[in-house]
């Protein structure tokens, strides 16, 4: 019979630590959140603004497209502008097709980037493939930069895939085309990493990723990579999609892999709504890591879903207000109140689970449900502290939350 301990997360897979502009990826370091801009990198103002927004939202690494001379020329200026804003956020250059040429022609760009991302499926073709791949690796060695070898199934090395398909067709028990494609993705990453090491790039300068669009494929290829190498791994779907579908797909895929100890950095590739907020993908990535217990970024607000006992919307509005206040104040609170991200707040709507859930939180309130006495007990550190009554229960509880934060986490600052 299984014990409760059997269902805890598996120990983190041992991977080699890679320093990306001062942010450690792998080697047991906290799982890193990263994101990518969707601006024209040559538009310096727009790119600086979006990188800054992503970084403020919590993105620890930000990737930018470097697709032509104008983009490459803009990179050192973007880096300089960000530093003037007090943002020493590592920038990752996303290269396809002509990365070797852009890095050679723009040495200031090569120096300003914290990492190069290359795709072995389009770094070059036929006779030029290994040569152009080697040129990028040599630039990484020259400037002492790490490289992410990022394989995408949408741009998979067709020569490798064809060879594996031919071998499979001749096998006694052939695999499905989907299974062969998974194998090709994994082999592309591993063969490219081996070639990079042969050229002279140290293993602690290599991160691998294998990106696909389907949840089961992401689970499979990353599990295979984890078994066959100790390189740091970057997790993410190639394109998760829009809205709730993208969030659910990302959480399902990465949640399973992370639970098995696999993954050193994640990116949630949400398709934003037209004129939508790009920082949403950062928030979702943080929430995946936080709800699974791997990292803490912001205080947790637990609230019941509501039922026939909670016809009032007061508890919903209160939970939303507290969540909004937390998001708004976190940039200041993070500096002013170290450890505040570990706070747990409960806002419950009736007597059934309200008191119990509130006791489990650092501070919680059990609001009256339909037909219940119009009083709301407040629990602090597991004990009933007081009961709120009257028309200002919500405002009074919000004030109590702020007071609790100041007293509990402000004392740490004073002690330090």
UniProtKB/Swiss-Prot annotation:
<comment type="similarity">
    <text>Belongs to the IspG family.</text>
</comment>
<dbReference type="GO" id="GO:0141197">
    <property type="term" value="F:4-hydroxy-3-methylbut-2-enyl-diphosphate synthase activity (flavodoxin)"/>
</dbReference>
<keyword id="KW-0414">Isoprene biosynthesis</keyword>
<dbReference type="GO" id="GO:0051539">
    <property type="term" value="F:4 iron, 4 sulfur cluster binding"/>
</dbReference>
<comment type="function">
    <text>Converts 2C-methyl-D-erythritol 2,4-cyclodiphosphate (ME-2,4cPP) into 1-hydroxy-2-methyl-2-(E)-butenyl 4-diphosphate.</text>
</comment>
<keyword id="KW-0411">Iron-sulfur</keyword>
<dbReference type="GO" id="GO:0005506">
    <property type="term" value="F:iron ion binding"/>
</dbReference>
<keyword id="KW-0408">Iron</keyword>
<keyword id="KW-0479">Metal-binding</keyword>
<keyword id="KW-0004">4Fe-4S</keyword>
<dbReference type="InterPro" id="IPR016425">
    <property type="entry name" value="IspG_bac"/>
</dbReference>
<dbReference type="InterPro" id="IPR011005">
    <property type="entry name" value="Dihydropteroate_synth-like_sf"/>
</dbReference>
<dbReference type="InterPro" id="IPR045854">
    <property type="entry name" value="NO2/SO3_Rdtase_4Fe4S_sf"/>
</dbReference>
<feature type="binding site">
    <location>
        <position position="304"/>
    </location>
    <ligand>
        <name>[4Fe-4S] cluster</name>
    </ligand>
</feature>
<feature type="binding site">
    <location>
        <position position="350"/>
    </location>
    <ligand>
        <name>[4Fe-4S] cluster</name>
    </ligand>
</feature>
<feature type="binding site">
    <location>
        <position position="357"/>
    </location>
    <ligand>
        <name>[4Fe-4S] cluster</name>
    </ligand>
</feature>
<dbReference type="GO" id="GO:0046429">
    <property type="term" value="F:4-hydroxy-3-methylbut-2-en-1-yl diphosphate synthase activity (ferredoxin)"/>
</dbReference>
<dbReference type="InterPro" id="IPR004588">
    <property type="entry name" value="IspG_bac-typ"/>
</dbReference>
<protein>
    <recommendedName>
        <fullName>4-hydroxy-3-methylbut-2-en-1-yl diphosphate synthase (flavodoxin)</fullName>
        <ecNumber>1.17.7.3</ecNumber>
    </recommendedName>
</protein>
<dbReference type="Pfam" id="PF04551">
    <property type="entry name" value="GcpE"/>
</dbReference>
<keyword id="KW-0560">Oxidoreductase</keyword>
<dbReference type="GO" id="GO:0016114">
    <property type="term" value="P:terpenoid biosynthetic process"/>
</dbReference>
<feature type="binding site">
    <location>
        <position position="307"/>
    </location>
    <ligand>
        <name>[4Fe-4S] cluster</name>
    </ligand>
</feature>
<comment type="pathway">
    <text>Isoprenoid biosynthesis; isopentenyl diphosphate biosynthesis via DXP pathway; isopentenyl diphosphate from 1-deoxy-D-xylulose 5-phosphate: step 5/6.</text>
</comment>
<dbReference type="GO" id="GO:0019288">
    <property type="term" value="P:isopentenyl diphosphate biosynthetic process, methylerythritol 4-phosphate pathway"/>
</dbReference>
